[in-house]
Amino acid sequence: MAGKARVHELAKELGVESKTVLAKLKEMGEFVKSASSTVEAPVARRLRNAFVNNAGSPAPAAPPAVAPPTPTPTPPRTPTPAPPPGGPRVSAKPMPPRRQGVPTPGPKPKGPVPGPPQSATPVTKPASAHDIEVAAAEARAAALKAEQEAAVKAAQAARQQQRENVRREPPTEGGPRPGPRPGPGTMPPRPGSPAAGRSGAPAPGPGPRPGGRPPARGAGNNPFGIQGGQQRPPAAGAGGPRPSPASMPPRPSPASMPPRPSPASMPSQRPGRPGGPGSGRPGSGAGRPGGGGGGGYRGGGGGGGGGGYRGGPGGGGGGGGGFRGGPGGGGGGFRSGPGGGGRPGGGGRGRGGGAAGAFGRPGGRPTRGRKSKKQRRQEFDNLSAPTMSSGAPRGQGQVVRLSRGASLSDFADKINANPGSLVQEMFNLGEMVTATQSCSDDTLLLLGEHLGFAVQIVSPEDEDRELLAQFNIDLDAEVAEDRLVSRPPVVTVMGHVDHGKTKLLDAIRKANVVAGEAGGITQHIGAYQVHVPHDGEDRAITFIDTPGHEAFTAMRARGAQVTDIVILVVAADDGVMPQTIEALNHAKAAEVPIVVAVNKIDKPEANPDKVRQQLTEYGLVAEEYGGDTMFVNVAAKPGTGIESLLEAVLLTADASLELTAPTDGPAQGVAIEAHLDKGRGAVATVLVQKGTLRAGDSIVAGGAHGRVRAMLDENGNQVAEAGPSRPVLVLGLTAVPGAGDTFLAAEDDRTVRQIAEQRQARRRAAAFANSRGRATLETLMEQLKAGEKTSLNLVLKGDVSGSVEALEDALFNLDIPEEVQLRIIHRGVGSITESDVMLASASSEAVTIIGFNVRAANKVREMADREGVEIRYYTVIYQAIEEIEAALKGLLKPEYEEVELGTAEVREVFRSSKVGNISGCIVRSGLIRRNAKARLLRDGAVVADNLTIGSLKRFKDDATEVREGFECGLTLGGYNNVQVGDVIETFEMREKARA
């Protein structure tokens, strides 16, 4: 049965792409899945016809070379002797067809006419080769079946005549001489080559064949062989003389033959053909040395294995080949490699003989042997890990400036890369980061170093400066000298807690501020301006009071940055304290002059000289000791030395500082403090540094913006404008700015709104990057385990932003064990509202609301009771810190330690069928208590542990405990391996206090 053609073979044959063939088959209504699917022969025929019709080529008639116009019939069974090789050639005369209307095939040698036919005149290739193939195939099938019987007898007669001619006549000049059969190494030319398929070229004569093949065999797999019930002609090597090459008709020229039929165009069943002398079908090459005869379809040749359809050259002697290359002398199969020289009756392989096949595949029978351990080990050693290339660009040390909290998308925009490639690079580094996620500074620096870029994290000051530059605002622009006017000095009072800073300001202002502070300590910055007569002039001095508690470090640093002169207050009785040194360092960092006020000199234990000596160690040398620092002895309560202190401040300002600022232009300054007032909304205490601030100006302070509705001084009086060094209370902001945020006035509301929005976005990104832990592959399991930790969740609300900031920093600086964690889910300024309670109740864990100097309304308290939310109020910061620290320690899991109770020696062992062995003991130390844990010791070694004193009796009475020196009887809870002389040690587990 003929093989089916595949779609890609048809596409190659038709000269088009496979998808074109698939589309055409779909139009024809045929379902074909892919280019490797097979197509039935009728479908392939219709496909070729469809392509021929589309090309507009007319169906060709039978060409002259295929069907001559005047055929001369010949008697089918009368053999005719062959003419001499040098004689003239006659045209081939085809066999008259049995059925009319079927075109006869190309030039075919007639069975009874052994003479060499004259080559037909070469014709040009028809316009459509496929129609010719189909017609030729059908004609050959009909003609072969019709001449079957005549061909058998004609072949016998032709072989007999050839043998006689070989013995009688020598070979003609130029023809091949008969000789021995060529060996496997002698490779004849391929069929169709110029040497083998040239028109009129005589075929080489065969040599003597060894024994023949069996005369009759089944049809086998050859669709063109002898069908069932028919007789196969004898093999070419069955004995007798070989035919002379001169008497053999030459094969037709390939130029005069139609193209070879494709497998798809062949009929499924075709009649067999005789393997007679030189009777190869059109398309086969000349006979091979060592034997003549054409092979069957896709088969090896007869004697000597003639090549089949696209077959390799045949080998030595043997039988004729069958379907896809038979065992005939190594005949080549369908597209096979050259066959080896088979022994008589043997054959080569269809898929290549003993030699190497196509594409370097080894010949011979394919084996499926297992690989050796050495081969497998070598392959395993040669394996390499796959590498993933992200395609991210590599830098050469270029500087990339990124803001805090920047994402990988921002980084990609700077280096013109795809954000996805940076995500893959981070994954290769072991960190899981999305393209839009805010990254920490360490993550950005790590990625930059990996890619070869020098990443610079822009500081908040530079970032804000770049933001303002987009709106043509320059805070550091130089001011012409003619615009500068003198301004009052800004003095910050700093020192340790309870050293009298606020009381000193009260004495200067002649007011009592301490009475209004909770706990007598300052909770936030206060700014005041006082007028002092000096040299007959009314001089203004702006004072800023900072907290002295250790939690307010940020406030003290902020106060030192906005000041001109620092008054360092040191109590004469306490001397230098930790916050004194911290305030001194802040002042030195700000590079501002320092005036030391030695306070509380009215106390009996005061020692001002000791203070001077201590401060000398920190670089502050008094003028009386040869230094340049002014020391003033004051007493705040009686008001001693206040005038001397103010005079020292003014002298320092005049001598060391040139205090000038422009009064015209937009106002600029800093927000010292801010809070949320219940009736007035967001209120900020600002200090004007440049320009003049007026009511109605549009200002932006940090992430808050708005229009100035009113300005109040330190006494609560409204002011129309505020110049340089003037602290005022500003109303009208949309939100509460942060303490220390710079403020500036702009021309319109649109500008300040855009500046505020961009500041808020950048701060959120930076805060998110800092609060979010680095999700690495190594710490993934640790983060999952963190969900099992006990956590204390807080909502912080305070009266001013500085106090909330200080409380938050103090809580995060607590020494918290790893078993618990502190989470602040929200912080804000103002009273406790319903939204705070709703946020706390919506959390999956318990949340406590901390109110610092703020309270909750009755409605809010009722809602908190209903939702089960705890609210705690504090007015002093260190009380809040202590209680929260105690609460964190209370969340720790208890730890237990073993405490020994006593020991008892076993004196006697009593057997009991009910309770087991009963130990009669005497208590040697401590006491023995019922249900206590026990262990059994024998010769100093532990025999049994984790035992329990089951029953305890003193004689016949039950006892709860037995003390040292008394006898008792006890059981060990079912444990019976007790011997005389053993020691029973009892203990209990007590909870250990966690630090």
Curated annotation (Swiss-Prot):
The keyword Nucleotide-binding applies. It comes from the Bacteria. GO terms for molecular function: GTP binding; GTPase activity; translation initiation factor activity. Residues 60-87, 104-119, 177-192, 203-213, 242-264 have a biased composition (Pro residues). Residues 161-171 have a biased composition (Basic and acidic residues). It is found in: Cytoplasm. Residues 495-502 are annotated as: G1. Keywords: Cytoplasm, GTP-binding, Initiation factor, Nucleotide-binding, Protein biosynthesis. Residues 135-160, 193-202 have a biased composition (Low complexity). One of its GO terms (cellular component) is cytosol. GTP binds at residues 495-502, 545-549, 599-602. Its main location: cytoplasm. Residues 486-658 form the tr-type G domain. Residues 520-524 are annotated as: G2. Residues 367-376 have a biased composition (Basic residues). Residues 273-363 have a biased composition (Gly residues). Residues 545-548 are annotated as: G3. Belongs to the TRAFAC class translation factor GTPase superfamily. Classic translation factor GTPase family. IF-2 subfamily. One of the essential components for the initiation of protein synthesis. Protects formylmethionyl-tRNA from spontaneous hydrolysis and promotes its binding to the 30S ribosomal subunits. Also involved in the hydrolysis of GTP during the formation of the 70S ribosomal complex. This is Translation initiation factor IF-2. The gene is infB.
